[in-house]
């Protein structure tokens, strides 16, 4: 009885120990042509891998597959074996093999089902005399397909009819003859454009943005660019790549499907601030934005902005856009702007510009504007705001290759402008002295660059750099550039700093939640310089600041709402600022 129990226990222990698989402790690889890293990657084995029945056969099959794809069709894998160790839990794996002689491409025969002027030989001739490599052949076929698709043949087919393998009877070398069958398909032109889904926008507004002439030859690269052109209109949800088909009349039809979004928006808030002391009147404060970006579906746009900051400061702005003047690629823009700044001055501007749409990515504009600065009767000698009139002329260059205006995954936005303002001071008389220069020329230089790059899926790096400089013999406060806030240096108040020279940079890491909504972390830097003005008791001010934080940009019916929490240099968490902004481009 005791012997039977002992025997049963030994049997159980043996079964229990054998249930644990052995693991690979060391892998020895021998190779002449390929690296050890390549062999291990193709064999899909690593140290600590558990040994299973058929492991060596799996390694042989995987290596044979990868070797043959790279032209080594005569390999021998008899040297793959598993060696047990004294420690029964581990084994060593030895991978020895013979690659054999490579197989070389001898001939490439191309058969055509129809005739065309496209010469495909140049895409395959260079393969002759090379090692027969599956991936090189596929790459050549893809290049030939791409070339044909961009040259009027979207329905081309290239088929590998066969590969004939043989050995040279004299030298014993291995060769392969490749037989290809090419069917060009119908040569295609874009004869019609069919737009679907546009309930408000006119067809001609969409087709003119495409810049496709009737009968233009088909190009796949151009077709893939069309969504970017339509997205810039900001009338639609992200547009998909158009489809191309041949109708019963053998005409090429480009089918574009769009989904319209809200383009006419109103948002605002109105409040009333009661009097804080006897004898004082209350006042209305608030913000109103009206944006009509596609009037009657014609692409015309108008906007109205009103904001009452406090009792004495107010902004009013009216804009209008007339696109594609008389059917030509020229846009006319007009702006009427008025700002009341505290109790110091009233600024009024009337500007107009003519923009030439040179290509779908590049535009240039000339602008002219008039401006007047009217000092308030309450202004004192310390502020010394002059009554002046300004005539401004300028030029602007814009390059925009972004794939989407709201949440781009790639592309750049570059804007460079120059303007010359002729300023004439006409009062108040008590401030005008004999040595005061009353005719002043002011030059403004502006540079802005944004670059976007998708590092990983739905993760985008955005980098922006902006610089502005004002040159002239004499500056007033209304002439200076403003820095700080949601659109420049976050972590600081809106327009907190003034300077004749300002610059800032923005670095954002964005994670896309939807196509046009994303969360982001940011790091901003900003610099400003305002030179001293001894006559007005203004000291020189110059500083470099940083801001950083996190934010969220969400697409809404009113536009894209950007909300961020930012900290300035030296701020504690409780000192952080929350910035709100609606990106609703005019």
Feature-to-residue mapping (PLM):
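Sec-dependent N-terminal signal peptides
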Residues: 5-17
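Gram-negative/organellar outer-membrane beta-barrel architecture
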Residues: 117, 219-415, 483, 498-502, ...
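C-terminal transmembrane beta-barrel domains of outer membrane proteins
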Residues: 210, 282-291, 303-308, 312-313, ...
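Short, active-site-adjacent cap segments at secondary-structure transitions
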Residues: 165-166, 373, 390, 528-529
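Periplasmic polypeptide-binding modules associated with outer-membrane biogenesis and secretion
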Residues: 2, 20-276, 283, 289, ...
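Short acidic/His/Gly/Ser-rich catalytic and metal-binding motifs that mark active-site loops
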Residues: 36-38, 117-119, 201-205, 374-376, ...
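Short small-residue beta-strand/loop micro-motif enriched in glycine and branched aliphatics
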Residues: 48, 104-107, 188-191, 265-268, ...
């Amino acid at each position: 009885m005791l012997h039977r129990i002992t025997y049963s226990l030994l049997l159980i222990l043996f079964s229990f120990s054998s249930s644990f698989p052995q693991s690979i402790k060391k892998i020895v690889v021998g190779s002449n042509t390929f690296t050890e890293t390549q062999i291990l990657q193709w064999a899909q084995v690593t140290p600590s891998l558990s040994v299973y029945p058929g492991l060596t056969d799996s390694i042989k099959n995987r290596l044979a597959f990868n070797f043959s794809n790279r032209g080594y069709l005569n390999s021998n894998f008899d040297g793959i074996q598993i060696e047990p160790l004294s420690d029964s839990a581990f084994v060593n794996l030895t991978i020895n093999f013979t690659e054999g002689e490579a197989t070389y491409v001898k001939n490439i025969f191309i058969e055509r089902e129809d005739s065309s002027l496209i010469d495909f030989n140049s895409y395959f001739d260079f393969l002759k005399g090379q090692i027969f490599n599956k991936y090189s052949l596929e790459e050549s076929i893809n290049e030939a397909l791409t070339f044909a698709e961009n040259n009027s043949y979207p329905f081309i087919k290239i088929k590998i009819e066969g590969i004939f393998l043989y050995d040279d009877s004299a030298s014993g070398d291995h060769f392969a003859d490749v037989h290809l069958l090419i069917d060009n398909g119908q040569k295609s032109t874009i004869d019609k454009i069919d737009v679907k889904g546009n309930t408000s926008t006119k067809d001609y507004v969409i087709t003119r943005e495409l810049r496709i002439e009737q009968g233009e030859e088909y190009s796949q690269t151009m077709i893939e660019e069309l969504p970017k052109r339509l997205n810039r209109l900001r009338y639609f949800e992200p547009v998909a790549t158009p489809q191309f088909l041949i109708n019963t009349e053998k005409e090429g039809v480009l089918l574009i499907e769009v989904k319209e979004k809200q383009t006419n928006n109103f948002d605002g808030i109105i409040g009333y601030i009661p009097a804080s002391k006897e004898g004082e009147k209350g006042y209305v404060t608030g913000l109103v934005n009206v944006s009509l970006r596609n009037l009657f579906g014609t692409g015309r746009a108008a906007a109205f902005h009103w904001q009452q900051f406090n009792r004495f400061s107010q902004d009013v702005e009216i804009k209008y856009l007339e696109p594609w003047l008389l059917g030509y690629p020229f846009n006319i823009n007009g702006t009427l702007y008025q700002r009341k700044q505290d109790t110091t001055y009233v600024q009024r501007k009337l500007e107009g510009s003519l923009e030439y749409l040179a290509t779908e990515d590049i535009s240039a504009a000339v602008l002219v504007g008039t401006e007047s600065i009217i000092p308030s009767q309450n202004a004192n000698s310390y502020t010394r705001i002059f009554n002046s009139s300004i005539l401004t002329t300028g030029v602007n260059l814009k390059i925009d290759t972004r794939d989407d205006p709201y949440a781009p995954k790639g592309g750049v936005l570059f804007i460079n402008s120059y303007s010359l303002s002729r300023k004439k001071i006409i009062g108040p008389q008590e401030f005008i002295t004999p040595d005061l220069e009353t005719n002043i020329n002011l030059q403004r230089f502006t540079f802005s660059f944004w670059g976007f790059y998708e590092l990983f899926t739905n993760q985008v790096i955005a980098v922006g750099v902006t610089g502005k400089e004002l040159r002239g013999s004499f500056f007033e406060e209304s002439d200076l550039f403003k820095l700080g806030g949601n659109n420049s240096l976050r972590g600081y108040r809106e327009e907190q700093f003034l300077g004749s020279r300002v610059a800032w940079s923005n670095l954002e890491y964005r994670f896309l939640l939807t196509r046009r909504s994303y969360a982001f972390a940011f790091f901003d830097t900003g610099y400003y310089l305002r030179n001293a003005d001894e006559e007005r008791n203004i000291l020189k001010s110059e500083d470099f600041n940083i801001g950083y934080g996190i934010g969220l940009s969400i697409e809404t019916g009113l536009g894209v709402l950007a909300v961020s929490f930012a900290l300035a240099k030296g701020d504690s968490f409780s000192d952080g600022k929350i910035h709100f902004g609606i990106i609703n481009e005019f």
